[in-house]
């Protein structure tokens, strides 16, 4: 019998600013508690990561600052676009993240939303902030790598 190919999870949205502004130390996968109209909006890709971050309250992790646009074809039951959404993580993962954020001055940022086996998952990253100088160095390093790759391809 032939083996089935594993499909890579299809991305809904990426947080491009996070890769530019933060250096990732560790990444995790978390589930989200969503309402039906939020899922339908996410299937259409109507989400914005602009000011998203993870907040810890009473032993729970919450996704704050993510805008999921209202679903057009919903009736009278519409979700609130900017409400905080609970993350589904194990208690030990939450404790570990919370302690590292408090001790080392790191932050937890959302990286991407994607479908995994019919469920919507959020990739979060424990990250260290970059300053402007580090960002410029990173851009220079990428430009140099791109130029050398281009020259090697032409050689």
UniProtKB/Swiss-Prot annotation:
Molecular functions (GO terms): RNA binding
Disulphide connectivity of cysteines: none
Gene3D superfamilies named in the record: 2.40.280.10
Family matches, as SUPFAM superfamilies: Small protein B (SmpB) (SSF74982)
A GO cellular-component term linked to this record: cytosol
Cited InterPro entries: SmpB (IPR023620), SsrA-bd_prot (IPR000037), SsrA-bd_prot_CS (IPR020081)
Main location: cytoplasm
PROSITE patterns: SSRP
Alphabetized Pfam families for the sequence: SmpB
Subcellular location: Cytoplasm
Any one biological process term the GO annotation gives: trans-translation
UniProt entry keywords in alphabetical sequence: Cytoplasm, RNA-binding
PANTHER family, sorted: SSRA-BINDING PROTEIN (PTHR30308:SF2), TMRNA-BINDING COMPONENT OF TRANS-TRANSLATION TAGGING COMPLEX (PTHR30308)
NCBIfam families for the chain: PRK05422.1 (NF003843), smpB (TIGR00086)
Cited function: Required for rescue of stalled ribosomes mediated by trans-translation. Binds to transfer-messenger RNA (tmRNA), required for stable association of tmRNA with ribosomes. tmRNA and SmpB together mimic tRNA shape, replacing the anticodon stem-loop with SmpB. tmRNA is encoded by the ssrA gene; the 2 termini fold to resemble tRNA(Ala) and it encodes a 'tag peptide', a short internal open reading frame. During trans-translation Ala-aminoacylated tmRNA acts like a tRNA, entering the A-site of stalled ribosomes, displacing the stalled mRNA.
Family: Belongs to the SmpB family.
Protein name per Swiss-Prot or TrEMBL: SsrA-binding protein
Organism: Maridesulfovibrio salexigens (strain ATCC 14822 / DSM 2638 / NCIMB 8403 / VKM B-1763) (Desulfovibrio salexigens)
Gene transcribed to yield this protein: smpB
């Amino acid at each position: 019998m032939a083996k089935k190919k594993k499909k890579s999870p299809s991305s809904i949205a990426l947080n491009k600013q996070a890769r530019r502004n933060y250096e990732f130390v560790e990444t995790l996968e978390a589930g989200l508690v969503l309402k039906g109209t939020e899922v339908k909006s996410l299937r259409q890709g109507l989400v914005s990561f602009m000011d998203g971050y993870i907040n810890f309250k009473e032993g729970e992790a919450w996704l704050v600052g993510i805008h999921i646009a209202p679903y057009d074809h919903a009736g009278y039951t519409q979700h609130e676009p900017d409400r905080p959404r609970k993350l589904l993580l194990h208690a030990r993962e939450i404790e570990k993240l919370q302690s590292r954020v408090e001790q080392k001055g790191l932050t937890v940022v959302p990286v991407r939303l994607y479908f995994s086996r019919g469920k919507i998952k959020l990739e979060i990253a424990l990250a260290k902030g970059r300053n402007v100088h580090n960002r410029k160095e990173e851009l220079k390093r990428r430009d140099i790598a791109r130029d050398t790759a281009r020259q090697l391809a032409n050689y």
